[in-house]
Design a protein with these regions (language model features):
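Active-site helix of classical SDR
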Residues: 117, 153
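Conserved glycine-rich cofactor-binding loop
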Residues: 10-12
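SDR active-site lid
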Residues: 170-263
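Substrate-binding pocket helix/loop in short-chain dehydrogenase/reductase
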Residues: 93-94, 98-103
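The beta1-alpha1 cofactor-binding region of Rossmann-like NAD(H)/NADP(H)-dependent oxidoreductases
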Residues: 35, 57-67, 99
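Residue(s) in the substrate-gating loop at a strand-loop-helix junction
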Residues: 137
Length: 328
């Protein structure tokens, strides 16, 4: 019987991941600030015949995260997988952000990942087994305008994870840490993110459904991989940043500004979730079902790499045979 802890599990990707892990036979501990949404997430897990534990807390509180890990091991058993999904953001130009906002985004998105990793690591290393999955973004590699705080925090988490991975390799530890870099996903966060944009925030197209992200997270937990790039926008962003970063600067400067704003004007006085959760009844999906893709061919290819390689070799053999036949 396997146990997984998922932070940020009250809605969006974390909520979809809780269901996906339960479908694979895991008992699931869900962690986030909003107790009501956590109870709903736990009910979905129990409806699938698995045990669930609700852990309402703020991942920026290291002591609370550590105490929660103790509870999980006492009640559900040893933690096999820890998924760091919790994150937050503020939309706006750099000069519009306050020091407090930058601190808060960093605390949740970066320090929350670090605290979750430390809580998992202190339990997994003595057992010499376990997997830590860092839910990241293509923005950890290629930053975009209007989300400087979030991009910086995700890049920091990638640097932290790379260092940890090397330490585990040096010690020949069987504990594994992996990162899943996601594209834009249709989650409820766009309805409650703090924003100073003149128009309502939206995911930068193309957009994917949370179930695509959840499938990638579960696969990364169960298969050895250093990183998993989900969706062609992430792959192109990573490659573009490595090959032609200056060109990418100009591309995102032109495209990402308008692409992150809908045609609807921003609603004045709308509550946001930066400091406190917004009390709304939501699950995994946001309001962009009309444009979100339910699958990713590139993710399928990664998950079936051997079959794809075999098919490619088969096609190559047929082509070589055809050329030889035509020559004769």
């Amino acid at each position: 019987m396997s146990v997984v802890v998922i932070t940020g599990a009250g809605a969006g990707i974390g909520r979809a991941s809780a269901r996906a892990f339960a479908a694979r036979g895991y008992d699931v501990a869900v962690m986030a600030r909003d107790a009501d949404r956590l109870e709903a997430a736990a009910a979905e897990v129990r409806d699938m015949g698995r045990r669930a534990m609700v852990l309402p807390l703020d991942v920026a509180d290291a002591g609370a995260v550590e105490s929660a890990a103790e509870r999980v091991e006492a009640e559900l058993g040893p933690i096999d997988v820890w998924v760091n999904d919790a994150a937050t953001s503020v939309y706006g130009t750099v000069d519009q952000l306050t020091a407090e906002e930058l601190h808060r985004v960093t605390d949740v998105t970066y320090h929350g990942t670090v605290y979750g990793t430390l809580a998992a690591l202190s339990r997994m290393r003595p057992r010499d087994r376990g997997v830590i999955v860092q839910v990241s973004s293509g923005l950890a590699y290629r930053s975009i305008p209007l989300q400087a705080a979030y991009c910086g925090a995700k890049a920091a988490a990638r640097g932290f994870t790379d260092a940890l991975r090397c330490e585990l390799m040096h010690d020949k530890s069987n504990v594994r840490v992996t990162m899943v870099h996601l594209p834009a996903v249709n989650t409820p966060q766009f309805s409650w993110v703090r924003s100073r944009l003149p128009r309502a925030a939206q995911p930068l197209p193309p957009v994917y459904q949370p179930e695509v992200a959840a499938k990638a997270i579960v696969w990364a937990a169960e298969h050895p991989c250093r990183e998993l790039l989900v969706g062609w926008p992430v792959v192109l962003g990573v490659l573009g940043q490595r090959i032609a970063p200056g060109l990418m600067d100009r591309y995102v400067a032109n495209r990402a500004w308008e692409g992150q704003q809908s045609d609807e004007p921003a609603r004045a006085g709308r509550p946001d979730s930066l400091d406190e959760p917004v009390a709304v009844d939501v699950a995994a999906h946001g309001t962009f079902d009309f444009e979100a893709s339910p699958d990713s061919p590139l993710l399928w290819a990664e998950m079936h790499r051997r079959a794809v390689a075999g098919a490619a070799l088969g096609v190559a053999a047929v082509m070589v045979g055809a050329v030889r036949f035509l020559r004769h």
